[in-house]
């Protein structure tokens, strides 16, 4: 299957493409974000992945243009630390087969970001905060085994920096939930 990865950083893009190729996935990529739907046709791809550094308005415009080119193409928001696993799971159809969690949301409340998730099956959870500054910074907020039922984690606002941030929740080592926060 052919995949197109759209990202901001040439180095990161090459690492993601190499990881996909190691899994037997034909991977193409571009850092010419604004021209992606002109330079590539979604009919040539099973999946188009958008990296976390792609600005939201540009991402939405590209998704619309790619959807017009190929209504069946999978359009996936992802980011570097999980991109290879995330893309491979999407190609297998695993993203629709959530085994561990459902209803994921992140809200802001009294100086913190609250992560809420309905856990359907007990397992391990890891909550991480990523920040893209001069390089990608990661901090594990919480890592533990949890029972089924409602799950909540609090991320203090001091962990969220100026610029692009991602909150990543991994359930059972294989299900990914993430939320993008851009702070000025």
Regions inferred by a protein language model and the residue ranges of each:
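Conserved phosphotransfer microenvironments
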Residues: 50-65
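Short, aromatic- and glycine-rich surface loops/edge beta-strands on solvent-exposed regions
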Residues: 155, 161-175
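Ser/Thr/Gly-rich flexible loops in soluble cytosolic domains mediating phosphotransfer, phosphorylation
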Residues: 65-101
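Conserved acidic segment of CheY-like receiver
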Residues: 1-10, 48
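Aromatic/hydrophobic beta-strand junction motif of beta-rich domains
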Residues: 111-122, 129
